[in-house]
A protein has these predicted regions:
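Conserved acidic/glycine
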Residues: 86, 99-103, 110-114, 298, ...
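Thiamine diphosphate
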Residues: 7, 13-18, 57-59, 65-67, ...
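Anionic group-transfer/hydrolysis microenvironments
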Residues: 26-28, 50-52, 139, 193, ...
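Glycine-rich, acidic loop regions that bind phosphate or pyrophosphate groups
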Residues: 1-93
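Active-site diphosphate/adenylate-binding microenvironment
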Residues: 98-176, 182
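Structural beta-sheet core signal
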Residues: 24, 48, 134-136, 187-188, ...
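Structural signal for hydrophobic packing residues in well-ordered secondary-structure cores
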Residues: 20, 26, 74-85, 97, ...
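Short coil/turn segments at secondary-structure boundaries
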Residues: 88-93, 137-138, 283-284
């Protein structure tokens, strides 16, 4: 049904307050998922399967804590469960999904306005790389890519979730490609995150790792800028970036490069990147002050999710 939490999907956040059973497998109930923990799954019995005893009842009380390796404990539970009809519950999720689809997703991937936007870029890449492993860095591109990419296979996304590890994406993409050499690996990274581990372009060059890098350049630390816009009256503090010349950096590491900023360039540039046998850096200059929704304001219950 999608992702839960601050920038998760509409349906799981809205239905969090209505569920009567919530099964959490190996999770830490961090604030990016729970929002206000006192209102998380407030009407549900919570079953928490966890290998680390320190995580049990740390932030959210578990009615049924199950301590152990989930490879052993989960089958012990599932073998005792009989199949039930949840069609009515699933239909309620579909109603919420359709709201998000119509109000958020379809407008975000539509090719309109003077500037490219992150949602349409993710959608366009997904159409041509339908068997790719998706890797994200941290920030707005992480939210767009994780929610809008069209996954057709398991084990196809590597992202650091709510840990906020800027710079994670580039080295993670290198590892993903080495671990799965027969699959394309597409990295979505912002201009701020790329500069955290920019030196790993040298690793790509030295080791000949053909990672496809989609650089979403909006000239901001976009996620922090969005918070400053929405909650601090547009008082932008240390979020606007003066970037280096990414073309010179790519060329200096012998990595093919292209920069685009128009809708009519997008599909052809992605095709060029896909056909390239080596690594490729595609810089996409996107709308500078685009916001990513849905969003749960900090400290609020997850069902208080905003669509705008």
């Amino acid at each position: 049904v999608g992702m839960l939490g601050m920038h998760g999907n509409y349906a799981p956040n809205i239905k969090n307050r209505d569920c009567d059973l919530l099964v959490a497998i190996g999770m830490r109930f961090d604030d990016r998922v729970t929002g206000d923990p006192s209102n998380f799954g407030i009407n549900a019995k919570i079953v928490h399967l966890e290998i680390d005893p320190a995580e049990i009842n740390k932030l959210v009380y578990a009615d049924v804590p199950v301590l152990g390796d989930v490879k052993r404990t989960l089958p012990m539970i599932t073998e005792k469960i009989s199949k039930c009809d949840h069609s009515e519950w699933i239909d309620e999720f579909r109603v919420c999904y359709n709201i998000e689809r119509e109000e958020i997703i379809e407008p975000a991937i539509e090719r309109r306005g003077p500037h490219l936007r992150m949602g349409e870029v993710v959608d366009a890449v997904a159409r041509q790389f339908d068997d790719a492993i998706l890797v994200t860095d941290v920030g707005q591109q992480q939210m767009f890519a994780s929610r809008y990419f069209r996954f057709k296979h398991t084990r196809s996304i590597i992202t650091s979730g709510g840990l906020g590890t800027m710079g994670f994406g580039l080295p993670a993409a290198i590892g993903a490609k080495i671990g799965a050499p027969d699959r394309d690996v597409c990295l979505f990274v912002g201009d701020g995150g790329l500069q955290m581990t920019l030196q790993e372009l040298g690793t790509i060059f030295q080791s000949s790792v053909p990672v496809k890098i989609i650089l979403m350049n909006n000239g901001f630390l976009g996620m922090v800028r969005q918070w400053q816009e929405l909650f601090y009256n547009h008082r932008y503090s240390f979020t606007e970036l003066t970037n280096p010349d990414f073309e010179l950096i790519a060329r200096g590491n012998h990595i093919p490069y292209r920069c685009i900023e128009r809708h009519d360039e997008l599909d052809e540039a992605i095709a060029q990147m896909k056909s390239c046998p080596t690594a490729f850096l595609l810089e996409v200059r996107v709308e500078r002050e685009e916001n990513v929704f849905p969003m749960v304001p900090a400290g609020m219950p997850v069902n208080d999710i905003r669509l705008e």
